[in-house]
């Protein structure tokens, strides 16, 4: 059954960020970006990461080295969880911790994916890859709901990445996730300092 809100309407939720490559392709935006605007790179990040911006030095490095995909990673702090860089079938990929073998201690991997990607637009346009749907349990209006999401880190299976370790502290921070208004208010001085430094 589809989940319904208390008022009987179907519950609407944001899709997983893994829908973005297909949406850019299927909408024609990516094709027009390449053909009509001469676009070369697509920058993708989570909306809640207020530290992420397009960095000209990173973009220049990508162009000079003809790297198809750059994934930003940061040092883990506390209970950080998320996709981690690993080798799988002799390829570098981002693997979500729940997909790692039980014998592998995810805490031994000291960095994780910030969900900030810089990708060669032509490679993204030509990517033929079916992202996996992941079952995610959530609480909605006090009731258990299951939603299906696709995760952008899986793009690394289809496009070979380079991993860029970026700072998460101080005015150079590129990872500043803010999940709600209370956290936004609490971290406002830090956000303002980062914005002024850029």
Model region roles, listed by residue range:
Residues 30-46, 51-55, 60-198:
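Catalytic core of tubulin tyrosine ligase-like
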Residues 1-39:
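Conserved N-terminal catalytic core of the sugar/cofactor nucleotidyltransferase
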């Amino acid at each position: 059954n589809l989940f319904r809100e208390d008022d009987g309407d179907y519950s609407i939720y944001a899709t997983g960020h893994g829908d973005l490559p297909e949406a850019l392709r299927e909408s024609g935006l990516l094709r027009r970006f390449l053909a009509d605007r001469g676009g070369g790179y697509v920058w993708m990040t989570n909306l809640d990461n207020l530290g992420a911006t397009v960095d000209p030095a990173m973009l220049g490095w990508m162009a000079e080295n003809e790297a198809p995909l750059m994934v930003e990673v940061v040092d883990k702090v506390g209970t950080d969880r998320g996709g981690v860089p690993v080798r799988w079938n002799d390829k570098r990929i981002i693997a979500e911790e729940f997909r790692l073998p039980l014998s592998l201690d995810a805490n031994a991997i000291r960095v994780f994916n910030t969900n900030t990607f810089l990708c060669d637009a032509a490679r993204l346009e030509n990517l033929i890859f079916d992202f996996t749907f992941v079952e995610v349990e959530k609480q909605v209006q006090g009731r258990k709901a299951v939603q299906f999401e696709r995760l952008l880190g899986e793009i690394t299976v289809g496009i070979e990445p380079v991993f860029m370790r970026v700072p998460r502290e101080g005015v150079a921070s590129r990872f500043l996730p803010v999940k709600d208004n209370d956290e936004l208010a609490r971290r406002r001085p830090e956000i303002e300092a980062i914005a002024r430094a850029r």
